[in-house]
């Protein structure tokens, strides 16, 4: 969905947007030092699945844990200035000299100051499924404007996902990445960042 586990070289663990069972995907048990929540919808703020008494960064709050720094910029969950679904926090992480951007439930093309803040990320996780968020075309527009090295699509239909959203295929097609094979984990280091689109396996697959 939009939940990722990021592990720094020193072992610090960050979990983003933990979801609940309404999504239809198996809900994992996780342990973390820091949890970030892009907005207060139940498929993005289920802190009960995260053990370890983590620090929690909600909305646009900055945080620093175990050498990992995170800040956020505010945008919207829809294309009407938040009138339909409220605000969305785009989270920027600085991990081991890498810039990692998690777009949350982005619902529109961000304003120019927001685009500048997320420019040239090493890794960007971006929703592509539409309906609740931007779709494949909207995601590509943001990618083209901000030029991340590695793009990880999220928030799309999988076999057991109960939401009325599109699968990842339209995004892969529009990005020229139809042959991308899902991977369970991804190792990223400064100077060694996989370029292009990387598809992660959903939790339902393992």
Can you describe what each PLM-predicted range is?
Residues 5-40, 44-60, 74-88, 106-117:
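Pre-active-site segment of Zn-dependent metallo-hydrolases
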Residues 13-17, 69-75, 92, 99-105, ...:
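Active-site-proximal beta-strand elements of phosphoester/diester hydrolases
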